[in-house]
Amino acid sequence: NIVNFDLRCLQKFCDRLNLVFKLGRNDENIIWRKAAQGNDRFYALVPGRVILDGIELMRTATYSFENFSLEHVSRQLLHRGKLVDDVDERGKEITDLFENNKPGLARYNLEDCRLVWDIFEKENLIAFAIERSSLTGLELDRYGGSVAAFDYLYLPRLHRKGFVAPALDQLESRGVSPGGYVMDSIPGIYDNVIVLDFKSLYPSIIRTFHIDPLGLIKGLEETDAIPGFDGGRFSREEALLPELIEKLWTARDQAKANSNAVLSQAIKLMMNSFYGVLGTLGCRFFDTRLVSSITKRGHEIMIASRDFIEQRDYQVIYGDTDSVFVLLGPECEGQVSEIGTKLAADLNLWWREQLAQSPGVNSYLEIEFETHYSKFLMPTVRGSDAGSKKRYAGLVRTGTGRDDYGLIFKGLESVRSDWSQLARHFQQVLYERVFLDQPYEEYVKEVVRDLLDEKFEDELVLRKRLRRKLVDYVKNVPPHVQAARKAEAIRAESGLPTLYDSGGWIEYLITVNGPEPRQYRQ
């Protein structure tokens, strides 16, 4: 968090001492811009230099951690951490080091620098930033910027065709397009469930059906245009996005062949951003006919694929956006791989034949046999018999040995950072026993006994993010906000600086006295 912590602190020190913060080349000043939204968040521009913020860069590269603090990320990736990891004790110890042991303070600071550098080195983050910048035209230290990146790739191609793009103030909103298609699930515990997954579904739809801003303008004038949705029609000849995606697709395949994972990831993120860009009012090409012709086509493809599979006497128990979950059952043990591979091949062939007939296009849809769950659980919605959505768990075999397996959880407590460690661990062990046909009743009773005997207090800690300033929580004051306010009151009495006034993460427990911050638990 170099911008909003390190550099902001240095700026405040300079202000206090009436110094100019000259960090740029040629003694140029650092330039600050306050974020339009966010708790005291700033952007920093340093002339002639690039500032790479590790947190923002890792989020851009789709890393996911419960906590993006240097201590947590370094423990996860490097298996080592800061020399002092307790927030409050760290402040006291740093002050003591400054006053009594400056070499020790230097060691502490140097280790922080080593941790950051080693994370960047291990994960190739600088290479990712360079590849992303080369691909999108964005500055190395600009994060997000999908619309600007789209303009960088699309506008020159549009201009070479002799067209000028509309200005943002010329846009009109024409309703809302739906999101991805999510099927109603059939709850239960199953044997042998396979997942068939469309490879990059939305980019494939754009290529197949010529979804494109220029193609839309031209297609509305043509009699033989490819039909879209909500009045959209797309030219068979004049389209830029399909060609652009084809080039990116080829480049990604080449990057994979060259084992260039960094470039492959950058290209994937770029291709997958096109749908979102076309659906935002911040894009000069925004038109619901474009977006709905992608999402509604996705709905149509998912429903038709489900029907194709069920006509072959296999049950589809769930589907979500680009994935279909197919039940094979215990009788197919030993044939799962063969069935999954054949189903995917048959479905790809069927789509090629169908789309060649109507609307007369080449199909770039590609479904793959992705995962085999030897055991699979689709839960019900709490308090209902209806199947849930975006929540499931399964056991995947990774080898032939007894212990060669892994558990996969989606949307359940075990993968939610705002649930306690006990809840997550309990769910993992319980599901593991159920999937492996092991007894679980005594385990449940044992956990309940130990819980009532207060053996799990450290595992009952909850962790949640404060997304606004504490003072901004007025009408609705959830438990984690109450805990943060208690923590700030205790810190104020002890003469400690504020920790949560501007947001952040809070760890707390639910007690008979209400929510209490973990670090000040009585």
Each language-model region and where it sits:
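Mixed-charge, glycine-rich, non-catalytic linkers/tails in nucleic-acid processing enzymes
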Residues: 21-24, 76-77, 81-161, 262, ...
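Carboxylate/His-rich catalytic cores and anion/metal-binding grooves
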Residues: 7-8, 203, 255
